[in-house]
């Protein structure tokens, strides 16, 4: 048995893996033109359009993402290649395909969880939530400067290193080219995060939509997952603004979630909002990424 195969089997025995894959996961080989990999047979995540598996290459845990060709084209590969060196964006290591699937081989972030599960059982303190949202704005700004819009910003598409509190954006299956001037009539993201102008009029502009989704992520960081607010709650004028945060925090959320998109905060003004006063405008890397996996492989 090769060392990568041994390492993956060890990972599958950890409590984290037992929870994610169940004890039935086994290890199989998969070859590309460049490398031999080992992959768990049970997915970490099963979605309507893709399945995500844990894998291993020499010295490095990795993620396999299988995207159905019937559901969506291979745009995610094009976008990830264009964003390859963009801070805060998950890295594409390699790409292959078969008759049914686009297969993306993506970096694995140890000690991480998606933001949805990070605040599943707890409400975040304002200081931590504010830093997460500020990181998110900076990352989206970097994506914007490369000429793209993510298209599906939500808790599940953000992963956080639970030790360093650093986030990365994942799942670019809904990403499209940036077009600031023309209305968009197709919604590729998640319905619960849709902006009210699309709900009412059937169109939206990309940057006001982005501001809306950032506001949705922000307001839900202060709630248990089971209490998450979505568009319908806000349209009903439910009291969605967290009580125990600063006035500038309340102002930020209110101005991001303004029903009238013309009165909503502009995307370019987000980074200079008073709520983020004193925070550094830089995206910290997750230290020793791709090198030190001693906390995962035991």
From Swiss-Prot:
**EC number per UniProt:** 2.7.11.1
Annotated organism of origin = African swine fever virus (strain Badajoz 1971 Vero-adapted)
* Protein name (database record): Serine/threonine-protein kinase 1
Q: Which residues form a coiled coil?
A: none
Report the sequence similarity comment from the record.
Belongs to the protein kinase superfamily. Ser/Thr protein kinase family.
Which compartment or compartments is the protein found in?
Virion; Host cytoplasm
Against PROSITE patterns, the record matches this protein to: PROTEIN_KINASE_DOM, PROTEIN_KINASE_ST
- Signal sequence region: none
Induction (free text):
Expressed in the late phase of the viral replicative cycle.
Location of the active site: 152 (proton acceptor)
| GO CC terms, sorted | host cell cytoplasm; virion component
Matches recorded under Pfam families: Pkinase
Which catalytic reaction applies to this protein? L-seryl-[protein] + ATP = O-phospho-L-seryl-[protein] + ADP + H(+); L-threonyl-[protein] + ATP = O-phospho-L-threonyl-[protein] + ADP + H(+)
- Report the residue ranges that make up the Protein kinase domain in this protein: 38-276
For this chain's UniProt record, which GO biological process terms are given? viral process
> Which top class of enzyme applies to this chain?
transferase
Main localization category: virion
Q: Which residues cross the membrane?
A: none
Q: Name one GO molecular function term.
A: protein serine kinase activity
Question: What is this protein's function per UniProt?
Answer: Essential for viral replication. It may mediate the virus progression through DNA replication.
